[in-house]
Amino acid sequence: MDNKQELRCWAKEKRKNISIDNNLLVKNLMQTEAYRNAKNILIFYPLKYEVNLLSLLKDKTKNFYLPKIDGESLLCCPFCEGDELCESCFKTLEPITDPCKKQMIDLVVVPALCCDKKNYRLGYGGGFYDRFLNDFCGTKIVCLPKKLLVDTVYPEEFDIPVDLVITENYM
């Protein structure tokens, strides 16, 4: 593969054939120091074939947030198990709650199609998370199956690496 677009296509096809152990990925995330120390955590509502982290919502010692797209920005909205969601312009589910200040978030679990050895992630190409992470001061983590780790995701100057990539084998 020679570019991000080819890699996106490869990763989307690959993950259709991967059995994701969501419980193990959640367990491994919960064992990290970053998770244990965080109070306010931004996760994402999973798309088909994505890692599903929603079982984290059972942890009542944490406050959870889901992203909401507003123009070019990604907002952080409080979310609890059972809260109402609405469909966004991208056909993803978003909370209907009012957003909080980004500075409140201690930890963000970022969605990714795949990640490389330098902790760069390949997203869907909209740049929402890269813009969000540009001045984010908390910890950035990706959880994904180890079969979606690659040599490079062809990072560009605006791409932001995460602090930690968690797989079934932990890190």
Placement of each model-derived feature along the sequence:
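Internal, well-ordered alpha-helical segments in soluble enzyme and binding-protein domains
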Residues: 7, 25, 128-129, 161
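A residue-level signal for conserved active-site and pocket-lining positions in enzyme catalytic cores
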Residues: 11, 43, 64, 109, ...
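N-terminal active-site beta-alpha-beta segment that forms phosphate/nucleotide-binding
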Residues: 1-101
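Short glycine-rich anion-binding loops that position phosphate/pyrophosphate groups of nucleotides
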Residues: 46-49, 113-117
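Surface-exposed, charge/polar-rich loops and edge strands
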Residues: 2-4, 103-108, 117-120, 131-171
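Charged helix-capping and loop-helix junction motifs
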Residues: 58, 123-129
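Short, structured patches in soluble enzyme cores that scaffold and shape functional sites
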Residues: 68, 78, 94, 112, ...
